[in-house]
Amino acid sequence: MMDTTKKRLPLVFTIIILFGLISMFGDIIYESARSANSQYLNLLGINAAKIGLVFGLGEFLGYFLRLVAGILSDKSGKHWIFMFIGYGMLISVPVMGLTLNWNFLFILILMERIGKALRSPAKDTILSKVSEHKVGVGIAFGIQEAVDQIGAFLGPLIFTLVFYVTGKEALNQYQVGYRVLLIPFILLMGFLYYVF
């Protein structure tokens, strides 16, 4: 029994690290957008009241729907489906670089927040089940969060680098920044499929 547990430990740690990388790429996308969205919308001439309304609604949906997603994910047992749909909705961020229509941009911002609500409870459930009897839930979440925070740091740097390379901070540069986020999105979905 002891030998079996020891053999499984490297696999469990690998899964935890992969979950961390998935979260990291998700955070690169999310934090990049978060650092740029308000200024991008401002450059499009959208007033502060509308921007505040969409961000407020997005945050509300992002937290309220976690409860709904958690209940549905537990009742159905389809945690992976919730993860794939939730992370898949991050495609909304790179797509923001393809449109100047503010109505569509608002929908994309809300989509990203809804995606976060769908994936978070499912991801936490899977991670806790994988790690519970092998390494401990606290250690697993600690490792995953540590890797995840790298993404929170790297995300805003993407737009900074785009502005630095082009030498200006204009509408086109914001669109390039959003489009570049397709790369971490593809990597994220690849890692997610691999872990699945």
Where does each model-flagged region fall?
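Cytoplasmic helix-loop-helix junction between adjacent transmembrane helices
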Residues: 108-150
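Structural signature of the two symmetry-related core transmembrane helices
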Residues: 81-95
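Helix-loop boundary and gating motifs at the non-cytosolic
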Residues: 5-62
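Transmembrane alpha-helix termini and helix-breaking/packing motifs in multi-pass membrane transporters
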Residues: 39, 43, 154-173
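Residue-level signature of mid-helix packing/kink "hotspots" within the transmembrane helices
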Residues: 59-67, 153
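Helix-loop junctions at membrane interfaces in 12-TM secondary transporters
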Residues: 96-109
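Helix-to-loop junctions at the C-terminal end of transmembrane segments
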Residues: 65-77, 163
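Symmetry-related core transmembrane helices of the 12-TM Major Facilitator Superfamily/SLC fold
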Residues: 175-194
